[in-house]
Amino acid sequence: MITLTPGRLTLPQLRRIARENVQIALDPASFAAIDRGAQAVADIAAKGEPAYGINTGFGRLASTHIPHDQLELLQKNLVLSHAVGVGEPMARPVVRLLMALKLSSLGRGHSGIRRVVMDALVTLFNADVLPLIPVKGSVGASGDLAPLAHMSAVLLGIGDVFIRGERASAAEGLRVAGLAPLTLEAKEGLALLNGTQASTALALDNLFAIEDLYRTALVSGALSVDAAAGSVKPFDARIHELRGHRGQIDAAAAYRSLLDGSAINVSHRDCDKVQDPYSLRCQPQVMGACLDQIRHAAGVLLIEANAVSDNPLIFPDTGEVLSGGNFHAEPVAFAADNLAIAAAEIGALAERRIALLIDATLSGLPPFLVKDGGVNSGFMIAHVTAAALASENKTLAHPASVDSLPTSANQEDHVSMATFAARKLTDIAENVANILAIELLAAAQGVDLRAPHATSPALQHAMKTIRADVAHYDLDHYFAPDIAVVARRVRERAFATLSPLSFESEQ
């Protein structure tokens, strides 16, 4: 059980919500603030004075006053008219994050929503009755309206859900969870719909995947150093301390740790080679820059996870209703775009190391890492696959946040495209997982070919993990299953956990 303290969520909590089947509870310390916010909205509605989102229309229709007897209908119509998402359903971890983030935002007491509505979301979450939310349809301002509308419609008994992974109607989902359809009161529909929780959930889910891939790439990159008989001198701490970037310093330390005790390295210490290619030698510089970006993005997303991104905001102490723009997801868009660049670079550098390993001139290994080349093609086309994926990622890494299209009759005339920025990270991460799987196979092949010299004790664990599923490549065979099984192990963090470097979300 994870207790959600609104405004004080942690990255480890969020990773567990995404990756484990933990249940959640709202911190009782938040109840008083929630109740004050709900009462403030009720008081404003009773007075009948115009207040955006409470008794007015929305967007370009904000100047339209809504009579008191139509306020509940206004909120219902808002939810139903905004549930216009298209595409495949959001993944289960993303929906779980989305619901937890929405509860945190609402729980700070500035949205004016009753506890009964929040309790219903908690009950659905813990019953594993998750709204079916189409992944496409948000521009990241005014919040993630369409995705959150699909979440909210379920509270009304409308739409679809997944009950323990099986698709069903929202009405059936409520029945299984022991709930009745809700009637939303003044502002509650808007409070549920307005916010950056969809884009932030997508970005967080992919952040955790990219953190795992980063750790895996440290292992695969170190293994490639030994496979290519590369030098460990470029990882000397003194080099990186002179430059001063924290990520570079930490990455170099990880490579030193992973390669410590390598007999392969000792075997060629006095060779004639002066410098290795950049894909080996500059790993701390490139991976360090990636590490800095990942850490920065994590910090931004944690702030957003704890933010109140509703509009308007209720300030119960003064009774004020303030309209602003916290729903604009530009910080999330920038963070996701930076993650895309970092993840694409992780894959691009790994692809270059694969190219180095299969090149006999550069690596000193048999061409394409196979004996009897000619009749056997070895890793020739596995590298082509890695190149295809790395190239695809370069296009996917184009920033989504540099685009904007006006909506709502030009009332909402600049948007963030944060949801797309976060969504395309899924494809980038999947491509990187496959590139790293190919590198791990190629590097393991190269290390085998360095026998009788052995790699380091740390990297021998990686070798054992690979060889538990895939044998040494002696002769050409149907290769795709080898890549698939190692990619699955990459996703399962089998290699990430071998890295000495870890992230805040894993603490």
Curated annotation (Swiss-Prot):
EC nos: 4.3.1.3
Enzyme class: lyase
InterPro entries documented for this protein: Aromatic_Lyase, Fumarase/histidase_N, HutH, L-Aspartase-like, Phe/His_NH3-lyase_AS
PTM-bearing positions, type 2,3-didehydroalanine (Ser): 142
Cross-link (5-imidazolinone (Ala-Gly)): 141-143
One Gene Ontology term from the biological process aspect of the record: L-histidine catabolic process to glutamate and formamide
Pfam families in UniProt: Lyase_aromatic (PF00221)
GO cellular component, one term: cytoplasm
Entry keyword Cytoplasm: yes
Gene Ontology MF term list: histidine ammonia-lyase activity
Record key words, sorted: Cytoplasm, Histidine metabolism, Lyase
Reaction(s) catalysed (UniProt annotation): L-histidine = trans-urocanate + NH4(+)
Top-rank lineage group of the source organism: Bacteria
Modifications made to the protein after synthesis: Contains an active site 4-methylidene-imidazol-5-one (MIO), which is formed autocatalytically by cyclization and dehydration of residues Ala-Ser-Gly.
SUPFAM superfamilies for the chain: L-aspartase-like (SSF48557)
Pathway involvement of the protein, from the record: Amino-acid degradation; L-histidine degradation into L-glutamate; N-formimidoyl-L-glutamate from L-histidine: step 1/3
Subcellular location per the Swiss-Prot or TrEMBL entry: Cytoplasm
UniProt-listed NCBIfam families: hutH (TIGR01225), PRK09367.1 (NF006871)
Family from the record: Belongs to the PAL/histidase family.
HAMAP family associated with the record: His_ammonia_lyase
Name of this chain's protein: Histidine ammonia-lyase
